């Protein structure tokens, strides 16, 4: 079998970027690798290396990127591709992740979050491409990761019956509360996947990354992902302002949107509890454990909504809090 280094060199040899200087970029929780290629004139592009043999597929990224760009949004332009072997050359949108810009210039925080909220308003008014639904059953099963991975990692034993009961009840809640016309949800819309592009105008000032897992879902999902960030504390005032800003700009039913926001908060944050536990236990990435207390706080806050009453006590009783002792049990 030809190794990936050889495959990559063959891919680059068929592009104008073959002789450009290469440097590794920080990766993410996936199996993808990224490099920045720098030309003799200082121009740069980004190489994505997504091994198909590790379950990666660049085709959804290409399809969604092209769609987002047709809507006037700043997804990277695809400069060259080899979908069979999992290589892409992308427009380089720079290094100014929202998280870095806010750390450097805290006064910009509200402006950046408002711009990211406006992206969602614009996207949710656009005609939607064909996407698989992010429906109640799938969402309930993904939430179950908190029981199968987070709970089991701490307690040392699983309870399939408990998980099955929860998923059945939660599916009913999702079906009753997460309703309406679906929109494209990127599913990982947060400050480390957004880039600030101040030289552009309007919604194009927000560079978009990591949208390849997009599905058809509820408009509240990406807004909640943005404002209940697993990696940084978003001020409560900004969260409340952006929810109100979205509701007013999108001209939608406020009560139903806020209910869906809370239910989806529990859904997503339960999934993240399980994913972070799995990344530590199964993949030797213990740094994700340090993020769990923040995710737990989002989850517990969401449980206070009356719509979650059918599962709230079950979850409070069965999911152990992330005490220092419990977190240590999740580390390899």
Question: What is each of the regions a protein language model found here?
Answer:
Residues 1-18:
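Juxta-kinase regulatory segment immediately upstream of eukaryotic protein kinase catalytic domains
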Residues 274-332:
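ATP/Mg2+ or Mg2+-diphosphate-binding catalytic cores
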Residues 26, 32-137, 145, 151-156, ...:
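ATP-binding pocket architecture of kinase catalytic cores
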Residues 31-38, 47, 171-221, 233:
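Active-site acidic catalytic loop and adjacent metal/ATP-binding pocket
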Residues 61, 109, 113-116, 139, ...:
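Hydrophobic packing residues in well-ordered alpha-helices of helical domains and bundles
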Residues 258-260:
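Hydrophobic, secondary-structure "cap" segments at the distal end of domains
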Residues 145-154, 216-253, 266-283, 295-303:
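Active-site activation/catalytic loop segments of kinase-like enzymes and analogous catalytic loops
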Residues 4, 8, 128-138, 142-185, ...:
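An alpha-helical support segment within catalytic cores of ATP-dependent transferases
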């Amino acid at each position: 079998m030809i190794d990936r280094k050889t495959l990559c060199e063959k891919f680059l040899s068929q592009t104008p970027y073959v002789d450009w200087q290469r440097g590794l970029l920080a990766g993410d929780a996936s199996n993808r690798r990224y490099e920045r290629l720098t030309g003799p004139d200082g121009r740069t592009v980004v190489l994505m290396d997504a091994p198909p043999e590790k379950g990666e597929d660049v085709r959804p990224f290409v399809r969604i990127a092209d769609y987002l760009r047709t809507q006037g949004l700043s997804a990277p332009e695809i400069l060259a591709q080899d979908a069979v072997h999992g290589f892409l050359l992308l427009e380089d949108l720079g290094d100014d992740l929202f998280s870095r810009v806010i750390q450097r210039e805290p006064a910009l925080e509200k402006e950046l979050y408002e711009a990211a909220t406006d992206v969602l308003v614009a996207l949710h008014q656009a005609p939607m491409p064909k996407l698989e639904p992010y429906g109640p059953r799938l969402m309930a099963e993904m939430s179950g990761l908190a029981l199968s991975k987070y709970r089991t990692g701490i307690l040392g034993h699983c309870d399939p019956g408990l998980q099955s009961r929860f998923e059945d009840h939660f599916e009913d809640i999702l079906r009753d509360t997460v309703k309406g016309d679906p929109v494209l949800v990127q599913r990982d819309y947060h400050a480390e996947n957004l880039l600030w592009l101040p030289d552009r105008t309007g919604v194009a000032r927000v560079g978009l990354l990591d949208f390849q897992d997009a599905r058809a879902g509820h408009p509240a999902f990406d807004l909640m992902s943005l404002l209940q960030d697993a990696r940084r504390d978003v001020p409560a005032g900004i969260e409340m302002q952006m929810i109100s800003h979205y509701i007013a700009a999108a001209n939608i039913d406020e009560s139903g949107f806020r209910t869906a926001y809370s239910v989806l908060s529990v859904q997503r944050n339960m999934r993240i509890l399980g994913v972070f536990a799995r990344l530590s236990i199964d993949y030797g990435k213990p740094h994700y454990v340090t993020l769990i207390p923040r995710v737990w706080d989002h989850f517990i806050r969401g449980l206070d909504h009356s719509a979650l009453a059918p599962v709230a006590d079950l979850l409070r009783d069965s999911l152990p809090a992330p005490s220092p002792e419990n977190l240590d049990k999740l580390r390899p």
